[in-house]
Amino acid sequence: MYTFAVDVEKYLKEHQDKPFILCEYAHSMGNSNGALFKYIDLEKKYSLYQGGFIWDYIDQALYHDGKLCYGGDFGERPSDYDFCGNGIVFADRTNTPKMQEVKYCYQYVDFRIDEDVIHISNNYLFTDLNEYQLQMDLLRNGNVVQTKTMTVDCQPLSSVDVENPFKINDQDQECAVTVYLKKNHEIYAQQQYIYEVKNKTHNIHTTKHVDIVEDYLNVGVVGKDFNVIFSKQKGLVSYRYHQQEYIRVPVRPNFFRAATNNDVENKYGYRYGKWLTASLYAKCE
C-alpha cells in the first residue's frame, strides 16, 4: 500500500513466482497524481505487476449555504478537514487536472512522434484502432495551422507506423504535433515537439577596460556602459546597462515550495522547514 515505485520494481525482480498488486498506489488529494506514470511504466516492463487502485474517484462534500463544504465547515471539532476530498473529480462531478493525468496514463494507445513517422502501439486486447478516427494537428508556436484526419488499421497488441503528413520547413518556429483518437469525442491524445527552437547564440565581446571597486559590504564592477554590484551577503543586487536597471530585487535561491494537501498530512512542513529557513537567510561566502 503506497509502496514507492522503485521498491515495487525491486520486489518484482526478486520475487518472480507470483503476481504483485497494490491495493492503493495514488492518494488523489489536492495537487497529486504527478508520479502515477512511474507505476504505469512498471506494467509495461513486468507481466507480474498487476497495477493498483487510486484512492479515490470523487471528492466527498456536502452543500451548505450554496457551496460545497468539508470537515470543519460546519463548526464541528475535532475534524479531518479536507481529508474527504481525495477524488480525481470534484464532488459536483466536474473534472480536476488529476483526471487528465489519469486519462493519459490509463490510455490503451501509445504514440511516439518523429519528424517523418508517427509510431502507434495498440495495447487493446480485442479492439482494432480502425474503429476510431485518427486526427493530427500541426502547431507552430502553440497555434494549430494544419489538421489531417484518417483511419488506421492496427490490430490488438500490435504496432504500426504512419507517415507524418506535415513537412517542417521553417526552423525559426517551434513545431509540435498533437495526435488524437476520436469516436464522437476525444478518447486519447498526445502532443510532442518535433522541432524546438534552440536558444540563439551571440558573440561575446570581451574588454579589459573594467574597474573593480570593493568595500566592506559590496563588490562593484564598472565598465563601458554597464556596472554590476554584488553584495557580500545577498549576491547579485544590481546590473545596469545603458542606464537601465535589470535587477528589481536581489536574486536569492529557493529550496522550498508550498506544501500540497498530501504533504500536510505527512508532516512535510516539519520535515523540510529547514530548507525554507535556508532560503530566507541564505548568505554569500
What are these regions (language model features)?
Residues 77-79, 90-100, 106-107, 193-211, ...:
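Extracellular/periplasmic ectodomains of large secreted or surface enzymes and adhesion receptors
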Residues 134, 138-173, 178:
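Intrinsically disordered, low-complexity Pro/Gly/Ser/Thr-rich segments with frequent PxxP/GP/PP motifs
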Residues 170-172, 199-285:
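Beta-strand/loop-rich accessory regions of lumenal/periplasmic or secreted enzymes
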Residues 168-204:
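Terminal connector regions
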